[in-house]
From Swiss-Prot:
Membrane disposition: Peripheral membrane protein
Cofactor: FMN
UniProt GO BP: aerobic respiration; lactate metabolic process
FMN hydroxy acid dehydrogenase domain boundaries: 1-378
Localization in the cell: Cell inner membrane
The protein's name: L-lactate dehydrogenase
Family, as annotated: Belongs to the FMN-dependent alpha-hydroxy acid dehydrogenase family.
Domain of life: Bacteria
EC assignment: 1.1.-.-
Binding site for FMN: 106, 127, 155, 251, 306-330
Binding site residues for substrate: 24, 129, 164, 278
The encoding gene: lldD
Taxonomic classification: Bacteria, Pseudomonadati, Pseudomonadota, Gammaproteobacteria, Vibrionales
């Protein structure tokens, strides 16, 4: 398959992956309306073309939480990344480091912190949920500190798991799920050999380290459902703020009042996110939510944004609307599944090229020069 655009990786991943894995990353919650709006609403944002601006000196570099970045992009935390490529979290982290951007490790990764962090020189970011088992939370935070993690991404939009109907149909969950997954793996021998056999162990590495026994894929859905805490409030985050002395980023903000609460709480950053359309269907797309949030808290903390970002043009749109940085989830997983580390590096090259074209033709010589003046007002 010829890869000429960042969006080509989705089809490449679909061809290579067993359906239960492809649809797990590709799908959203309920009717997937928000999933579609994330991309459709972004595509509807018109860029304002400007010419004859001498764009010979153009820079995509930025700085976030004292960390220099070659691109205003970070790789998002994605659960089970190690099921999409052999030791997938390690490969993705190495690709991110090679391109000069951060990688964020998920709580529910296959590869544990102790495997991923030493695989690169750049400090990884770590993502954590609020869970009922506070002992696990303290344990994993201590391990993250010991591994040199500086930035903590705290996900707050999963007090309960979203209803993801595709997972029932694809074999990730539902009747006879284990047998269906085995049959699907047999029909995809390349994945079965490279990841299914050579990529073992397939457990939730961060959780297994704490429990002292493997937490297998079969236990994944049940563990999530049993440990997410619907009683979560800002007060529950206070002990983590006291315990964690590095930058703390609150992920899952869609409302201006929540953004203001994050400022009052003392967060260093927020991620404007609807979890890629995987939690509450029918909420705003992130590109719809971002402008009001930027108007409310820009300058008080750093604003990151994810969900629906599929091209370098989308990155430019989000930055013009007030984001300081973007985060990629699905798109890097598609590339990782298709071509491993090399695929993620190539994906980021494509994003960079697309950004350079967009910024050259909108007259923005740097990330700081992108603003709503870079967009067509409608």
């Amino acid at each position: 398959m010829i890869i000429s655009a960042s969006t080509d990786y989705r089809a490449a991943a679909k061809a290579k992956l067993p359906p239960f894995l492809f649809h797990y990353i590709d799908g959203g919650s309920y009717g997937e309306h928000t999933l579609r709006r994330n991309t459709d609403d972004l595509a509807d944002i018109a860029l304002r073309q400007r010419v004859l601006s001498d764009m010979s000196e153009l820079s995509l570099e930025t700085e976030l939480f004292g960390e220099k970045m070659a691109l205003p992009i970070a790789l998002s935390p994605v659960g089970l990344t190690g099921m999409y490529a052999r030791r997938g979290e390690v490969q993705a982290a190495q690709a991110a480091e090679a391109k000069g951007i951060p990688f964020t490790l998920s709580t529910v990764s296959v590869c544990p912190i102790e495997e991923v962090a030493p695989s690169i020189h750049r400090p990884i970011w770590f993502q954590l949920y609020v869970l009922k088992d506070r002992g696990f939370m303290k344990n994993v935070l201590e391990r993250a500190k010991a591994a040199g993690v500086k930035n903590l991404v705290f996900t707050v939009d999963m007090p309960v798991p979203g209803a993801r109907y595709r997972d029932m149909h694809s074999g990730m969950s539902g009747p006879n799920a284990a047998m269906r997954r085995v049959l699907q793996a047999m029909a995809h021998p390349s994945w079965a050999w490279d990841v299914g056999l050579l990529g073992k162990p397939h457990d939730l590495g961060n959780i297994s380290k704490y429990r002292g026994s493997p937490t297998k894929l079969e236990d994944y859905i049940g563990w999530l459902g049993a440990n997410f805490d619907p009683s979560i409030s800002w007060k529950d985050l206070e002990w983590i703020r006291d315990f964690w002395d590095g930058p703390m980023i609150i992920k899952g903000i869609l409302d201006t009042e929540d953004a203001k609460d994050a400022v009052r709480f003392g967060a260093d950053g927020i991620v404007v996110s609807n979890h890629g359309g995987r939690q509450l269907d029918g909420v705003l797309s992130t590109v719809q939510a971002l402008p009001a949030i930027a108007d409310a808290v820009k300058g008080d903390l750093k604003i990151l944004v994810d969900s629906g970002i599929r091209t370098g043009l989308d990155v430019v749109r989000m930055l013009a609307l007030g984001a300081d940085c973007t985060m990629l989830g699905r798109s890097f997983i598609y590339a990782l599944a298709a071509q491993g580390r090399a695929g993620v590096e190539n994906l980021l090259d494509l994003y960079e090229k697309e950004m350079r074209v967009a910024m050259t033709l909108t007259g923005a010589k740097s990330i700081a020069e992108l603003s709503r003046d870079s967009l067509v007002k409608r």
